C-alpha cells in the first residue's frame, strides 16, 4: 500500500483500492475462506441433523409415555381413540424427522464434503494449491508495476525534499537581509544556496515526472494481468457460490415436510380420527358396560345350599389349568329330570402319582351322555371334591343316613382316610409356607398374597391342587398349592 504526503495537511492518506500493492490478498484469502465456509456449512447441517434426531426421540418418548397414561387412565370410547391418534401422529412425524436427519447427513453433508475435497487440494507444506496459484499469479502480475511505483515514490520523496530545502533557503535569505550584522559574503552564500535548491527542485521534478510516465506506461499491462488472475479467482468462487446455492435448495427440500405426501396424510388421518369421536356413542357404551344397561344376576330361589358350594368349586376348578390330569365334563343333575341333559362344563383334576390305576367308568355323570345313560364305577383312591347332583338325587333305603358306615359313597383308601367328599377334613398339622408368586383371589373364599409373603397351611393339598391356609391377619381361605413352598 503506497503512502502520499500532503505538505499542506501533513498527514498520511492511504488507499484501499484493489490496485494498490498487496491489496490482492483479500481475493486470495477468499479462496481459504471458501474452504472454511464448506466446513461451516457441514457443521451447520450436522447440528440441524442432531436437532432433528433429538426432536424425533422426544416425540417418540412423549407418545410412548402418554399412550400408556391414556390406556391406564379413565378415558374411554371414541374420544380415547381420538386422543391416541395424537400419539400416533407424533410417532409418524418422528419417523419423518429421522428421515430428514438421514437426508441431511447422508446426502447434503456428504455432498459438501466430497465437493470440498475435489475443489481444494492441500499441499505438503500447508495451505491449498489453489491459494498458492492465485498468490503467485497476482504477485507476478504486480511485480513490474510495483517496481516502477517504488521508483515513483522515491522520486516523489526526493522532489518534495528539494522543494522544502528551497523554501527554507528563501526564508533564511529574507531573514538575513533584515540583519545588519550579516556581512555580504554570508549573504552571497545564502543566495547561492537558493540557486542550488532551485536546480535540485527542477532536477527532482524531471526525475519524478519521468518515473510517473514510465509507471503510466506499465499500468495498462499491469491492470490486464491483474484482471486476468482476478477473473480466475472469480470463476473459482462462482463455482463455490453456485454449489452452495444448489446444496441449500436440496436442504430446503429435505426440511420442507409440507411437500411430503405422507406428512399431509398424517394430519388428514388425525383430523378424521378426531372428528370420528362421538360423545353420544361413548355415553351409550358407558351405560351398557358400567351403568344401568349392565346385566344383573338377580337373586333367585335356590333349592339346596350345597349347590352353591358345588358351583363355587367347579368355577375354581375351571380356572385351574393343569399340565396333566383327568378332565371331567358334562356334569348332569339327575333325579326327577334324569332324562334331561344339562349344559356341560369342564373340570380339570390333577392326576395323583400315588394312584396306580385310572378312572374307569361304565356310567359317569361327568361325561356328556345320550338319553340311554350307563352305570358308574370309581377307583377307590379317586377323591372327588364335590358330589354330583346325580348321587344327591338317588333313592336310598329308609335307614340311610350320613353315617359313614351306611354311606354307599364312603370309601377308605390304603391309609385309612375318611370320606373323600367331606370338605371339613383337616390334615391335622399346621405348616408355615412362603409365597413363590403373586396370587389374587378370584372368589370370596380364596386368599390373596404377594410373592415373599408368609402364611400358615392348615390343610394339605386336595385332588384339585388347592390348600387351605390362614394369613397372618387371621383370614382363612384357599390358595393354589404350587404357589407356595414350605419354610425350612
Curated annotation (Swiss-Prot):
The keyword Cytoplasm applies. Residues 163-176 have a biased composition (Basic and acidic residues). It is found in: Cytoplasm; Cytoplasm, Cytoskeleton; Cytoplasmic vesicle membrane; Cell projection, Ruffle membrane. SUPFAM superfamilies: BAR/IMD domain-like, SH3-domain. A motif (NPF3) lies at residues 419-421. One of its GO terms (molecular function) is phosphatidic acid binding. Transmembrane segments: none annotated. A motif (NPF2) lies at residues 407-409. The modification Phosphoserine is found at residues 273, 315, 375, 401, 448. One of its GO terms (cellular component) is adherens junction. Residues 163-183, 316-429 are annotated as: Disordered. Residues 11-282 form the F-BAR domain. It is a peripheral membrane protein. The modification N6-acetyllysine is found at residue 53. One of its GO terms (biological process) is modulation of chemical synaptic transmission. A motif (NPF1) lies at residues 364-366. Keywords: Acetylation, Cell junction, Cell membrane, Cell projection, Coiled coil, Cytoplasm, Cytoplasmic vesicle, Cytoskeleton, Endocytosis, Endosome, Lipid-binding, Membrane, Phosphoprotein, SH3 domain. The keyword Coiled coil applies. Gene3D superfamilies: Arfaptin homology (AH) domain/BAR domain, SH3 Domains. Widely expressed (at protein level). Isoforms 1/3 are predominantly expressed in heart and in PC-12 cells, a pheochromocytoma cell line (at protein level). Isoforms 2/4 are widely expressed with highest levels in muscle, testis and brain (at protein level). Belongs to the PACSIN family. Homodimer. May form heterooligomers with other PACSINs. Interacts (via NPF motifs) with EHD1 (via EH domain). Interacts with EHD3. Interacts (via the SH3 domain) with MICALL1. Interacts with RAC1. Interacts (via SH3 domain) with DNM1, SYN1, SYNJ1 and WASL. Interacts with CAV1. Interacts with TRPV4. Forms a complex with EHD4 and MICALL1; the complex controls CDH5 trafficking and coordinates angiogenesis. This is Protein kinase C and casein kinase substrate in neurons 2 protein. It comes from Rattus norvegicus (Rat). The lineage of its organism: Eukaryota, Metazoa, Chordata, Craniata, Vertebrata.
